[in-house]
Design a protein with these regions (language model features):
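Short helix/strand-capping turn motifs
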Residues: 2-97, 101
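C-terminal charged interaction modules
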Residues: 94-122
Length: 122
């Protein structure tokens, strides 16, 4: 049985990608992209998964601006709290297992955009 493990977490909106460097202007109205490197728990490597973390207010403003928001691969939280957000993500990732890495990655891609999502090998 293969189990997933987070190898690293980045936030793409900050130059150094360090989540500790990200401080939203409004903790109850923000949106940012988490880049997760996730792989099998028994190996060093991983693959990239991207997840938009945002608040309902941020979604509302995006809807006001554009009239709509695509909803796939979003984690919606009441306010920005890095510790809580990280715990939510880790709990889901740690719960994913399967007979192959493709099975596990498929489960992870339910909540985050997998770098190989939609890829069909020959």
């Amino acid at each position: 049985m293969i189990r997933s493990k987070i190898k690293s977490i980045e936030i793409t909106e900050v130059p150094d990608l360090n989540p500790d460097s990200f401080v939203p202007g409004d903790f109850e109205n923000f949106g940012c992209t988490f880049g997760l490197t996730v792989g099998p728990d028994d190996s060093d490597g991983g693959e990239l998964f991207y997840l938009t973390v945002c608040t309902p207010r941020w979604l509302e403003r995006a809807c006001e601006k554009d009239g709509f928001v695509w909803g796939c691969h979003h984690l919606i939280v009441r306010e920005y709290n890095l510790k809580t957000i990280t715990e939510i993500i880790m709990k889901f990732v740690d719960s994913c297992s399967g007979d192959s890495w493709t099975d596990v990655a498929g489960k992870l891609s339910r909540i985050a955009n997998w770098e190989f999502e939609g890829y069909r090998g020959q």
